Amino acid sequence: MKHIRNFSIIAHIDHGKSTLSDRLIQVCGGLSDREMDAQVLDSMDLERERGITIKAQSVTLEYKAKNGEIYQLNFIDTPGHVDFSYEVSRSLAACEGALLVVDAGQGVEAQTLANCYTALDMNLDVVPILNKIDLPQADPERVAAEIEDIVGIDAMNAVRCSAKTGVGIDDVLEVIVEQIPPPEGNPDAPLQALIIDSWFDSYLGVVSLVRIKHGVLKKGDKFKVMSTGQNHTADRVGIFTPKQTDKTELKTGEVGFVIAGIKEIHGAPVGDTLTLAKNGADKPLPGFKKVKPQVYAGVFPISTDEYENFRDALNKLSLNDASLFFEPESSSALGFGFRIGYLGLLHMEIIQERLEREYDLDLITTAPTVVYEVLMTSGETIYVDNPADLPAINNIEEMREPIVEANILVPKEYLGNVITLCIEKRGTQVNMVYHGNQVAVTYHLPMAEVVMDFFDRLKSTSRGYASLEYNFIRFDPADMVRLDILINGDRVDALAMIIHRSNIRHRGLALVEKMKELIPRQMFDIAIQAAVGSQIIARSTVKALRKDVTAKCYGGDVSRKKKLLNKQKEGKKRMKQVGNVEVPQEAFLAVLKLNE
């Protein structure tokens, strides 16, 4: 056991986690040169295209150290993006140490800090590593000082390497062996294994990635899942070297997979504990805290007969992505679908793309909303995540919106732009600290503003240098109202949104104009109105198409033309009473893209 090292790699987006893991795999000979591929561990097409890691992946490597002993390294590559921070905390729960990778050109960024504190909270040993020293703008001395100054861990003799060229990778491996403690656990105690991740394979059923804390899990053992109390037999156990490799047993301290032919999707939830069916452990291991979705949106299949497939797809995804929340919802405009809870906008985009790609669905999404706390005049408090569920205005005593604490790290020269942006987003400044060339600003911002387009705007005002990390702190009273869109006097439920009163004019006008472009002209006038309660705040009209009925008149009396025009008018009037307007799919998407 003292030859096992479990660690994960944490870093800000694009500081080279995945490339470093590729090098470690190559040096330890996990894959032959032919199978070696850039970013081996980012197995989803989506991850490769966007160049980001979404799911944490695990690998077991053998490393012969300089002292001649052979060590087993289990490491987990983690995502760097703020929306996936729960993936990081799950991976860290299975480790004794973490490599904090910092780009020697960019220096410390907000996510570096956030992930590092998560690791320190879990009592892990954090080992700093300066990556990308081959870059001309790399300045390892300055960055090492920055790590000590901002993060507060000793970094003067941090390993310097370049994952791209392979310089210093041996030093990284030596540091892992020396500085990360071996796992503690009792091989003779009853089995306790933590499920770090699980995914659904259509041939094998549920595949679970586990970390053995105590005891041993052998192939053919009968084990039980502690939360459901169900018993299963371990058909196969083994490790990833990135390839699936079967073994006869997983020992204490190891990380590996278990396949037990569990068919129902929620048979082995993430964060659960496995133990043996006979004389097993009494109590489960402390799991992870459940993450609460921050953003909700309605998602509907374009054709209603895809509803069943959509539900199956969501079930399979939710096994793999523990943070996904969904419940059925129906809308008069869009038919049946689901209300889905996400951790942020990137998460929402990724889930939607995965559903469309991996499960071949055509989907349409309504505007995302955050959860509001509503105090009713009757004294009860309700939580609303769908504009359609908002009670009537006269029943509401007070609306409270979620506030997040946003930590932004930005170079001095862009500070002004960032502050302007935060003020525009109704933020209040809490703190500002200068660290050399970087400034750390803390703002309290309404989550609804952060969710919409804050991240993109932050990146563009700071030329991509600012970085952001945020978490929910409390609900604050705010003057929020529901903006409805009426088409010919009928409310379209899927277009409603909850926004701050100061924005309604601007937002209403923009929406109405946008809808006017997108709704095709009919034989009668279509009135598009934006309303708050019963007050109309903006209107535009899609003009009717009309036939030139007087074309065949040649000369003659004006009353002849009048007669024809009046006849046309009558017809249009009748048509307007019975006609209904089809709102095209693009119009729903327009609501999402309003800010552009």
Curated annotation (Swiss-Prot):
Every copy of the tr-type G domain together lies at: 2-184
This enzyme's EC code(s)? 3.6.5.n1
Tell me the enzyme class. hydrolase
Q: Which GO MF terms does the UniProt record name?
A: GTP binding; GTPase activity; guanosine tetraphosphate binding; ribosome binding; translation elongation factor activity
According to its UniProt record, which protein family does this protein belong to?
Answer: Belongs to the TRAFAC class translation factor GTPase superfamily. Classic translation factor GTPase family. LepA subfamily.
Source superkingdom: Bacteria
Task: Identify the main location.
Answer: membrane
Q: Name one GO biological process term.
A: positive regulation of translation
Leader sequence range is: none
Q: What is this protein called?
A: Elongation factor 4
Look up the record and report any one GO term of the cellular component aspect: plasma membrane
Q: Does the keyword GTP-binding apply?
A: yes
Annotated keywords: Cell inner membrane, Cell membrane, GTP-binding, Hydrolase, Membrane, Nucleotide-binding, Protein biosynthesis
Q: Which reactions appear under catalytic activity for this entry?
A: GTP + H2O = GDP + phosphate + H(+)
Protein's cellular compartments = Cell inner membrane
